[in-house]
Structures are given as C-alpha cells and as structure tokens.
Amino acid sequence: MEFSRPPLVHVKGIPLIKYFAETIGPLQNFTAWPDDLLISTYPKSGTTWMSEILDMIYQGGKLEKCGRAPIYARVPFLEFKCPGVPSGLETLEETPAPRLLKTHLPLSLLPQSLLDQKVKVIYIARNAKDVVVSYYNFYNMAKLHPDPGTWDSFLENFMDGEVSYGSWYQHVKEWWELRHTHPVLYLFYEDIKENPKREIKKILEFLGRSLPEETVDSIVHHTSFKKMKENCMTNYTTIPTEIMDHNVSPFMRKGTTGDWKNTFTVAQNERFDAHYAKTMTDCDFKFRCEL
C-alpha cells in the first residue's frame, strides 16, 4: 500500500497525523489500569530508548524475554493507527498487566482515565534543536507524515507548532507543570546519555523496584544506541517500507546530543535562539544542547 502523505488534521487545535487524529475520539473511552505505566514524550526525544529500558526492567533484565516481539508490540503506542497494521488500542487488548504504554499526545488530548487513575508517568524531554533535526529526518522517512518541505520551512513550522503533535515548547512545559499534581518522573535525554546508570536508578526508585547491580549494568549495555540500532526488535526495520523507508533515513539515526550543529546555519541558529528565549521565558528548567 502506498501512502499519499496526507495533510495533518487539527484536533482541539493540535495538528496530528491524519490516521492518529481518527483515534482521539475512541481513546476517550480508554480505561487505564492503576498499575499501567505511561511513557510520554514529544516525538524524537528518546521514546523507544525509554521503552526498551523499561521493558528490560519489567523483565528483570532477561534478554530473551525482551526479544519476544518488536518494541511497538511490547509497548503499545496509544494513538497509533495505520491501515493494515494493528492500532495501538488493538495492541493494548493483547497486552497483559502490568502494561507499559507510550504516547506523544499533549495533555489536552490525553485520555482522562490516565489522569483519574493517577497512572505513573515517565516523561523524557530532549533539547529542541536536536529534536527538530531528528524530526525533519523522521518526517522524510515516515510516510504517514505530510512532505516536510525544505529544512528551513520545516524549522519555521516547528517554531510555529505546525508539525505533528503541535508545539514542542507547550509540550515540555505542560508535562513539567503536571508534576505538581500527578506522579511524573521528568527525565532529560541528555542526562540519560551522560549517565544512563544514574538515571535508571532514578527510574527504579520511582517505580519502587530494585534490581541487582549487575542487572542494571546489563540494561545499560543492552540499551546503548549501538546495541539498539543493531537490534531488529528495537530499530523498527520490521515495519513495512511503504510506512517507514529506512533507505531515506534510518529510524535510529545518530542518537547523539549536539548533532543540530551539522544542520543549522548560523542565521537559523540565531533566529531559533531569539524565538526560543521569547517562548521559554516563563520556564524554570534548562536544556543542554551539547554534552
């Protein structure tokens, strides 16, 4: 099946992939379970990485159990829908408790049940410059998105919140604020990159779990970018080419911090920084754009 790269559809003012927009209504009837764990991110912020870390924690670090199915089958993607592929809600029906779930939805579109049940959330935030570069490459290879156009026009659309899932700025801020009323562990991609063991220990504490030191070391090793890029259960190469074309750009491209410097021009960087300073003026947390 060839995808025609349909335009984004706005739901409550949030632009979404056309097929994903169709799930927002049905998702409102979704029933969360108290022992669910939600992984929330803006796209291209380490969702798959965190999904694999958490599945390894849930499986006690046993590699063969984590190889039971591709990551998107082990951690259902709530709003996912695509012709010819099981939807996120369909995958959920096959998922036994305790369930790991993932979403990129902003709070305004999140199923209310997740909030009512006080489902624990692990949120990963990544610096905007690396996100937008990664997102541009992802738009090019993932054909459910509209054509991204030129890099310069995509950058403008990102700053204006006119890309799938809307404003990065609003997303990272509203989930940060949710910490005051909801059990949210807010992590930074750059911190996990810098010291994965330290961050995994934070996750274990948040979940009220413990693992032997050697198991934690094994999780660090097997969730490294190199290992995950080689692993067909995590690198999305099992998705049909007509949906994701890895010849255009691999799903797991570089996984670094600071790669934006290879894409932004000096003028684009100045424009982005000025807009960022204005948009994030009320923000009480800081991102690192290089390590």
From Swiss-Prot:
One of its GO terms (biological process) is estrogen metabolic process. 3'-phosphoadenylyl sulfate binds at residues 44-49, 126, 134, 189, 223-228, 251-255. Its EC number is 2.8.2.1. InterPro entries: P-loop_NTPase, Sulfotransferase_dom. Transmembrane segments: none annotated. The modification Phosphoserine is found at S134. This is Sulfotransferase 1A1. One of its GO terms (cellular component) is cytoplasm. It catalyses: a phenol + 3'-phosphoadenylyl sulfate = an aryl sulfate + adenosine 3',5'-bisphosphate + H(+); 17beta-estradiol + 3'-phosphoadenylyl sulfate = 17beta-estradiol 3-sulfate + adenosine 3',5'-bisphosphate + H(+); 4-ethylphenol + 3'-phosphoadenylyl sulfate = 4-ethylphenyl sulfate + adenosine 3',5'-bisphosphate + H(+); 4-nitrophenol + 3'-phosphoadenylyl sulfate = 4-nitrophenyl sulfate + adenosine 3',5'-bisphosphate. It is found in: Cytoplasm. The keyword Ligase does not apply. It comes from Rattus norvegicus. Keywords: Cytoplasm, Lipid metabolism, Phosphoprotein, Steroid metabolism, Transferase. Its main location: cytoplasm. Belongs to the sulfotransferase 1 family. GO terms for molecular function: 3'-phosphoadenosine 5'-phosphosulfate binding; aryl sulfotransferase activity; flavonol 3-sulfotransferase activity; identical protein binding; steroid sulfotransferase activity; sulfotransferase activity. Induction: Induced by androgens and suppressed by estrogens. The expression is under the influence of pituitary growth hormone and thyroid hormone. Substrate binds at K102, T103, H104. Sulfotransferase that utilizes 3'-phospho-5'-adenylyl sulfate (PAPS) as sulfonate donor to catalyze the sulfate conjugation of a wide variety of acceptor molecules bearing a hydroxyl or an amine group. Sulfonation increases the water solubility of most compounds, and therefore their renal excretion, but it can also result in bioactivation to form active metabolites. Displays broad substrate specificity for small phenolic compounds. Plays an important roles in the sulfonation of endogenous molecules such as steroid hormones. It is an enzyme of class 2 (transferase). The N-terminus is blocked. Homodimer.
